[in-house]
Each structure stands twice: as structure tokens, then as C-alpha cells.
């Protein structure tokens, strides 16, 4: 099948909303409507205020920049599609298709001025068959029929032999996986119910190899505070595969669609922090807005706090609850949510994998930190607050109450800013998150 020829990616996203490419008239109409909505929202200060009501000024600035970038990208998508359709120049559209062989056929059809009906007639098949092929980007077509369509559209197929593990046999793909890591994943997976007790080392090696083929190797492990290379981290592969499998099960339940411009509910999310079961309520609220949150314990040695990526076009946030404290939970959740909202088109398809420790050297991670920090504690309020320098728990707790957030969040912020994790250790909501969320795992 054609899927074995495709450039492997961490996710295959087929929606025009997140892929940034328009391939038919319906997607063109939808994109134009979205541009119109963005233009209206950005047309005046009052329009922006209405859309971002209740959000801190610092967050409003970030959201506004995201909207401007979104509008610019959508206009470029429209230009690429119309240029291919009206002039036959498919260069811009092909650039957006990248090396995806299925999308390349659709681009070629558009550039030749063929409708789906025209192509079906030339192939001697029903129009509905072309519609099905294009709906899944030709994933379901046989190699023989792919070659037939490609020939009709004057698309050349080339085979290149290169030293790339994604094009080698399964044994070569997982040759670097140690027995120790295999045993570690087996122990963890059996304990957590990832797979049955009957799975052996050989089967797990095949599972890991197939996962690398399906998702590819992430070129970077993006951390909340720095960027480090984890392109061959087998523990990350295994954990990510588990998240993706659980996310697909949730997607099958037909959740509401996600809209990065729908942000009016964010203040309500922050207000949930004051509740004892706030983490559980937060996960339900995100699901109501088309964002899946999966709580899955990390494999020992991985040291991951959270992740954000797309699965079948749906945003997924993964949390490990590596540190069982309320302050860490809320900051990690909102950091990943920042990636979903701010970076929906500019990184989420590759994915973000976050650790809470060290110093950020990545622009998108710094943006996510800023978004999460200001959403929880508005920068202007924090700069004027005596709680920043207070040693009295009462002063800090009063500030949190005035803000309408859990005091653990403020105590955690102080510990981090002062780089002193010995203070207020009993004030950050320890041992209160796993108990209510790990039952999901």
C-alpha cells in the first residue's frame, strides 16, 4: 500500500485547518470564511477585547499575534490553491504539500484543471472512488493504481536508495535499542496495562520498529526550559506510541472540533484551580473544547512532564504527573495548552515534549512559558504584588485568593523565581494529583 512509500511523520494530519494546504473548493470556502472571521476580530480594539474578554493583557498580546500569523498563513494557502487552479502553476501548492505522494497527486489534478469527475472519467472509474482516494490522501490505493493515476497526471515516481533507517528493515531500525531499555519498557508496559503479559522481547522490538516507521523520529525533544536532541530515545517512542493509541480511542468517540480562536473559556479554566478536584474538572473542560488530555506515567528514565501534538488533526496533551504537586500540574497543563493554541500551525504537528527543569533557549517554549505564567498570574499584578518578596504564607495566600487561584500556584512561582526549593515545600499541593488522575491510565 502507498502508506509505506510516504515520508514518515510524527502525525498524519488530513484537515486543511492544521495542514495549511487547500485541496478542494469546500476547503477554499471554509478558509475564506475563517479569514473573514479573523479580519473582523482584528479590525478594531473593541473586537479583540470582545474575543479575549477576561484574559490578562499579556496573554491578549500573544493571542493577537497568533491571529495575525494565522490570517497571513491562510491567505497564503488561498493564493497557492488559486494559482494552481487558475494558471496551472502548482509551485506554491506543491511546496505546501511537501513530499507527501498522495497530496502530490491532488496538486497535479488541480494544476491540470481537472475536477474529480474529470479524473474519474479519464481513469474509467466512478467519481466517488476519486473522492475516497483524496479524502485519505491516497493512503488506501494500491501501488499499481497509484502509478496509473500518477501517469495520467504526468507525475513522475522515483525510487531512491539511501542510508536512512526509516527505509531499512525492521531489524536495522531498532538495532540501537538495548536489552536494558527493552526490559524497562516491558516491565512498565505490563504494569500499566499497555500490552499483555505474553508480549516478549522480539514482539516489543517489532512494535518499536513499526512505531518509528509510523511516526518517524522526532528531531528534537522540546523541553519547557531548553531544547535537547532525543531523536533516538526509544523510551520517548514507546511513551508517545501509548499516548497516540489512547488518543485514537478518544477520537473515535467523536469529540467536539477544536478551534484555536475559541479562547473565551480560558478564564473559567484558571478558576478551576481552586477546587480540590480541579485537575479532573480541567481535563473534562478541555475535552469539551476538542482537546484530548491523556495522563500516562512516564517510563522510568524518560524524565518528561508533558507533551502536545496532533493525532488525526486533534490536539492531544500528554501528562506524566512526574511531580505530584498542584503547582507543577497547572503550569505544565497550561504550558502544553499554550502550544495547542499558539502553535497549532507552527510546530504542533511535529510535537512538543516538555521537561520542567532548565532554562529555555527555544522561542516557542519561551512563548508557552510566558502564556502559562501570565494566564495563571497576570504579569502586571505580579509585578505590583508584595507576595513576590513575602516570607509570610498569609500574605501569599491572600494574594492567591484575590486572584481567584489556588495558593499552591503562587508558592510554586516564588520557589522557582527565588531558585529555592526548600521553602514552602508543604504549600504546593503535594500528593494530590496522581490520586485523582492516574485512574485514567
Where are these regions (language model features)?
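Short alpha-helical DNA-recognition segment
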Residues: 113-133
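Short basic helix-loop element that most often maps to the first helix and adjoining turn
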Residues: 103-120, 249-250
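DNA major-groove recognition helix of helix-turn-helix/homeodomain DNA-binding modules
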Residues: 143-159
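Active-site hotspot residues in diverse enzymes, especially metal/ion-binding acidic/histidine motifs
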Residues: 166-441
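Helix-turn-helix DNA-binding elements, focusing on the entry/boundary residues of the two helices
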Residues: 105, 116, 127, 146, ...
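N-terminal flexible/basic segments that precede or flank functional cores
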Residues: 2-98
